[in-house]
Amino acid sequence: MSALLPVFQQTSTLRDGQTIPLWAGPAPGALGTEESDIPAITVFLPRTMTQNTPAMIVCPGGGYVNLAANHEGRQVANYLNSLGLAAFVLRYRLGPRYHHPIELGDAQRAIRTLRSKAGEWRLDPGRIGIMGFSAGGHLAMSASTHFDSGVASAADIVDRSGSRPDFTVLGYPVISMTEPWTHQGSKNSLLGTNPDPELAKSLSGEVAVTKETPPTFIFQTNADTTVPAENSVYYYLALRKAGVPAEMHIFEKGAHGVGLANDDPALSEWSKVLANWLRGRGIIK
C-alpha cells in the first residue's frame, strides 16, 4: 500500500490499494494526527477501467466505535470490483472521540472527492454510489438524506462538487436514532449519551427521506437481534411514500454483521440480487 498522500498530491492514475486522505491538511475538527484522526479512502479497482467507470464508497460498520474493514470493507470492495465498479472503502472518524457532524462530513467529503476527481480517475460523476453496513449503513443513509450541490465559489475545489450520492446500498442498517428501534450503542457513539431529541430525530432515516433521496437497495434478516428489521422496514416505507425507487429483501435467517455471508447459501444470495438491481438501474452492464 502506498504512503498516505493528500488527494491533490496523488497522480491522476489511481493505484489499487492506495490510501488517500480526504483533506490535504488536518481534517475539519481533527483532534490529533493519529490514523484514526485522518479520514481516508482506500482504493479497490476492477480489472478493467473504462473512461466512465461506476464507483461505490463503502462504509464498514462497527457501532460508530470500530470499523469492520475486512468483511464489510475489503471483501465487499473486491466483490464490487468483480461487477465492474471501482470501490473506495471509507475510513471515517469514530466515537466516542468524534461525534456528529464529523462522521457525516467525512462521508460527504468522500462523495465530493470522487465527483471532483472523476475525470482524472476515469470515474462516471453520475454513477457514484454509497454503501454501508450496520452503523456504516446509518452513515450511508445520512449521506443520502443530508446533502448539497456544493459551493461554486469555494476555495477548495472539492467543495465545489455536490455530495448527493447517485444510488445507495444498505446492509442491515441502523436507521433510527429514536426509540424503540434505535441501536443504542451506535446512537451513543454518534451523538453522546444525552443528545438533543430534535437532532436525533433529524438523523433518523424514517423521517429524513425526501423525494430527492437516491434510489436505494436494502437487505436485512428477520433474525437480526442487534439491529431490528424494523429499521429497514420503516425506511423502505418512507422511501416508498416519497416516491423514491427502492428495493428491499428480508431474509428469514442470518445474524447481524454477516457481510457477504459467503458461508450461508441462502443469505449470500443478497449480493447476486444486488448485482441484478445495479444492472436494472443501468449502473453496471
PLM regions with names:
Residues 218-220, 224:
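Short beta-strand/loop motif that positions the catalytic acidic residue
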Residues 44, 219, 229, 233-285:
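C-terminal catalytic histidine-bearing segment of alpha/beta-hydrolase fold enzymes
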Residues 39, 154-158, 193-208, 213-214:
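Active-site nucleophile elbow and catalytic-triad environment of alpha/beta-hydrolase enzymes
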Residues 109-186, 200-201, 205:
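Primarily recognizes the serine-hydrolase "nucleophile elbow" in alpha/beta-hydrolase
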Residues 60-65, 222:
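Active-site glycine-rich loops that stabilize anionic/oxyanionic intermediates
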Residues 68-70, 74-76, 90-125, 261-269:
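Catalytic nucleophile-loop/oxyanion-hole region of alpha/beta-hydrolase
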Residues 8-50:
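N-terminal cap/lid segment of alpha/beta-hydrolase-fold proteins
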Residues 52-61:
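Short beta-strand element of the alpha/beta-hydrolase
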